[in-house]
Amino acid sequence: MLALLAFPTAGSRAAADPAACAPVRLSNVGWTDAEAVTAVAATLFEALGYAPRTPMLALTMTYVAMRDRRVDAFLSNWEPSGSTPIAPFLADGSVERLATNLSGAHYTLAVPDYVWQAGLRDYRDIAAWGSRLGYMIFGLEAGNDGNALVLDMIRANQFQLQRFRLVESSEQGMLSQVDRTIQSHRPIVFLAWEPHPMNLRFALRYLTGGDKVFGPDGGATVNTVIRRGYRTDCPNAARLLARIRFTIPDENIMMLAIQRDHMPPPQVARRWLRGHPDAWHAWLDGVTTRDGAPSLPAIRAFLAPGG
């Protein structure tokens, strides 16, 4: 886990952020987990007197916008899969990792359980199933970090995959394809991750053998990253961002409401915050409203019915 970075210290009233910090700009890349956690952060910032904005941006454009100081923070830097897109921005100092907000996640290739039972259990098995798979691996939107790893495998003929092609689509498009394929009991290989409701919706298995591509056992962490200078410019806002933490069950609950129940992410965030005060009370240590007042009463009032 990333260590919390040092922040300027001061008394509660002196902790107020300047007016220029009021518009907290949080990139939302459109993944369901990103929509959920971004909505939680935005709800808290609104309760604290900020004016959060959540522009929808592609992953690579998120980091460009942070470099150009048009976005302040991003709560969905998946690692190790996301190490390549963010690398040049970390190298030039325009973006910095602030904290890990989720541990114990997974991100790698998966198959339906019946395909796993039939013998496709490891990355080394994919090539032998080529004709049955139509030489296709299903991924996410163009520019996605997981897509890039799959494309690198294909180009390098890693695991003898040079005949395969990656089918790029939105998250919902890919999952619709997975659903149709499972309904017809055909084989499919696709990008999968946890937390996500797909783990409840489908009987799926994560493939082994991809440690050098997606990390050991497909394990992942998710980080909060901020633009250069944000801790100094807006220390109170950055302090809250540094303390936000989620668990896999937390995110599964919120994502299920978004996907299955079609609830808007801001509504999901409010419901989750109201139902899980013990989760976020600790995030407020040293955090005030934007004008320096105590944070907990402000958030309680905001979340109260009619607030």
Which residue stretches match the model-derived regions?
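Short helix-initiation/N-cap motifs at beta->coil->alpha
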Residues: W31-T32, Y50-A65, R165-Q177
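Ligand-binding cleft/hinge of the Venus flytrap
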Residues: A41-L48, G130-F164, R274
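Ligand-binding pocket segment of bilobal, Venus flytrap-like solute-binding proteins
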Residues: V71-L75, D145-K212
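A conserved helix-loop-strand patch within extracytoplasmic ligand-binding domains
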Residues: G93-G146
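C-terminal functional modules
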Residues: R245-G307
